[in-house]
Amino acid sequence: MKVSVLITLAVLGVMFVWASAAELEERGSDHRDSPAWLKSMERIFQSEERECRKMFGGCSVHSDCCAHLGCKPTLKYCAWDGTFGK
């Protein structure tokens, strides 16, 4: 009984190592290509609107913050103003 449990655990360990190595090899090729992919995605999502401060960015007036964000008067940072929509 003990031997069969040990053999089962050893087989599961070998399968885990084999699967991890295969996943690492597969992800490794994607990892080399990812910086170019990320740069292309950055260009796609760049806003054509005016530059605005994102969440928790510093601000002095409400118009400094992006849509649906408002400038908090005490600590001067952009936070959600409680609105939804476009």
UniProtKB/Swiss-Prot annotation:
This is Kappa-theraphotoxin-Cg1c. It holds the Pfam family Toxin_12. The keyword Secreted applies. The presence of a 'disulfide through disulfide knot' structurally defines this protein as a knottin. InterPro entries: Huwentoxin-1. Residues 22-50 form a propeptide. The keyword Signal applies. Disulfide bonds join 52-66, 59-71, 65-78. Keywords: Disulfide bond, Ion channel impairing toxin, Knottin, Secreted, Signal, Toxin.
